């Protein structure tokens, strides 16, 4: 059976990534890589959060992490930041990391298997129910104007 268009799209996105197993992702954070949790609040509340992870919901990711964006977070200092994206199962994070790479953030990658694999591997995880607010930056007049043409 031929792979679906979605399977092909995901495979193409992943072909640019050096994806990390949970233990390797955790070790990378201990060396200075930044773990970015893109899961929506209901998933973070239901399953817990990784201590120290930066919370940036998927719909704001590019604007918060790109160093040229007026809406960037303070950690978005340049193209060489090592961003490790985490979602629930490792699908959305692969697509998100590939987009970050396409925008010039060449060290962006994701966690194989997402939070489910992170938990199964025994990596640090806070209790369900407690959630941190997403990381925000001062809102510019137009997010789109900070990286090219207006949205």
Where are these regions (language model features)?
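Rhodanese-like catalytic fold shared by cysteine-dependent sulfurtransferases
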Residues: 1-34, 41-83, 89-151
């Amino acid at each position: 059976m031929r792979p679906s268009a979605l399977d092909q799209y995901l495979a193409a996105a992943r072909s640019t990534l050096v994806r990390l197993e949970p233990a390797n992702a955790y070790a990378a954070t201990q060396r200075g890589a930044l773990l970015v949790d893109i899961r929506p609040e209901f998933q973070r509340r239901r399953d817990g959060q990784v201590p120290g992870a930066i919370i940036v919901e998927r719909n704001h990711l590019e604007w918060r992490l790109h160093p040229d964006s007026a809406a960037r977070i303070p950690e978005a200092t340049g193209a060489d930041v090592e961003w490790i994206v985490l979602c629930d199962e490792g699908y959305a994070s692969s697509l998100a990391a590939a987009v970050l790479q396409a925008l010039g953030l060449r060290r962006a990658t994701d966690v194989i298997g997402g939070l489910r694999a992170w938990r199964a591997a025994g990596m640090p995880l806070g209790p369900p129910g407690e959630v941190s607010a997403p990381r925000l930056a001062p809102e510019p007049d137009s997010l789109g104007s900070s990286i090219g043409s207006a949205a």
